[in-house]
Amino acid sequence: MQIYMVGGAVRDRLLGRPVNDHDWVVVGATPDDMVARGYLPVGRDFPVFLHPETREEYALARTERKSGRGYRGFVVQTSPDVTLEEDLSRRDLTINAIAASAAWTGAEDLFDPYGGARDLQARVLRHVTDSFREDPVRILRVARFAARFTDFTVAPETMQLMREMVHDGEADHLVPERVWQELARGLMEPQPSRMFDVLRDCGALAVVLPEVERLWGVPQRPEYHPEVDTGVHLMMVLDMAAHLQAPLTVRFACLTHDLGKGTTPHDVLPRHIGHEQRSARLLKAVCERLRVPVECRELADVVAREHGNIHRSGDLGAAALVRLLERCDAIRKPARLDEILLACECDARGRLGFADRPYPQRARINAALAAVQSVTTSSVAAHAAQLGLSGPKVGEMIHAARVQAVADWLHATAQPAPEPQGNAG
């Protein structure tokens, strides 16, 4: 029985990156051998075991054979006769198909039959064998790795293979859970725009997210968007979200906030009147199709509907500011307002020449919320009761008190309006 470190741990160590998790493959063993040594079986689809002390995963060497279309169409075989090279051959990229002995101290302890170390040095993402085409999820993984390893390029032959897979309909069989899983992970990488560049290049974006794909080539008003192209703007917004270390909820909202611009009638371009509501409708369809988590879809919905109003909030008076806060549910969920405003800031700064501009709308709306929060609703309700009011009338009094609090703040501070963002959205 031989044990080897494999996958991302070897790759990242060779790149000089931090290694947080280790994956191990075991050659020449049976499940009974592993159990006899105290390993805990946890694998459902193939034999995977937890180390009795470190709790790291140890998988028996295995081969995979295509038996149908899509992600689940595989027959897995494990046997003590499966070699290390056979196990590595089923992996997606050469940089992930390097193994090292458990006592790894130098290059002599590496087993690299597919040239992964060479591709690491050359900064190339290259598929291991033609069996890459058997799993369409690998298209998404390559795109995600491009967003992580920002100085790597996809090998021409690998890009061609991915194009063939899309053309042959393999991407049509991606299951929603895996699409969302890879999309979410890719959005959290250092340069998420590169994921979408790769997906566009191979044709997969039109399959998994046609609502995003159609944004390229759609013009915007150059006085507000010097980059003009909506797809280019979207990628700049995503990379700004990564630069500001935004959480997944914000990054997904950034991805989907302008979907409606892809359905703007041609005769009104480059204006996009009403695109916010169209974006919200398209967002709903995307979330249902990909089974997007509730917290992501809820934030994205508010951002899609309200980002234009937030950009123009410098023109709003007290009553309109309070209504905006109410539509954002900011009074009940002030922490979520921070994420809404962060997404809007990414949108405003994700334009050519705007990356270093301030976004004063954020401070203005937060200050308006603070004024609203200064109203003690219980006191207002008690006063309403003294006046013999109840039901909706109490709510109206609370709303009026909040508007007055914001009006007083605006008057006391003589707040100047932020620079108009126009159609920054």
From Swiss-Prot:
Domain of life: Bacteria
E.C. no: 2.7.7.72, 3.1.3.-, 3.1.4.-
Similarity annotation: Belongs to the tRNA nucleotidyltransferase/poly(A) polymerase family. Bacterial CCA-adding enzyme type 1 subfamily.
GO molecular function: ATP binding; CCA tRNA nucleotidyltransferase activity; cyclic-nucleotide phosphodiesterase activity; magnesium ion binding; phosphatase activity; tRNA binding
Cofactor binding: number and manner: Magnesium is required for nucleotidyltransferase activity. Nickel for phosphatase activity.
Organism expressing this protein natively: Acidovorax sp. (strain JS42)
Recorded name of the encoding gene: cca
Entry keyword annotation includes tRNA processing: yes
GO biological process terms held by the UniProt record: RNA repair; tRNA 3'-terminal CCA addition
Protein's recorded name: Multifunctional CCA protein
Complex and partners: Monomer. Can also form homodimers and oligomers.
Residues annotated for CTP binding in this entry: G8, R11, R91, R141, R144
InterPro entries documented for this protein: CCA_bact, HD/PDEase_dom, HD_domain, NT_sf, PolA_pol_head_dom, PolyA_RNA-bd, tRNA_CCA-adding_enzyme
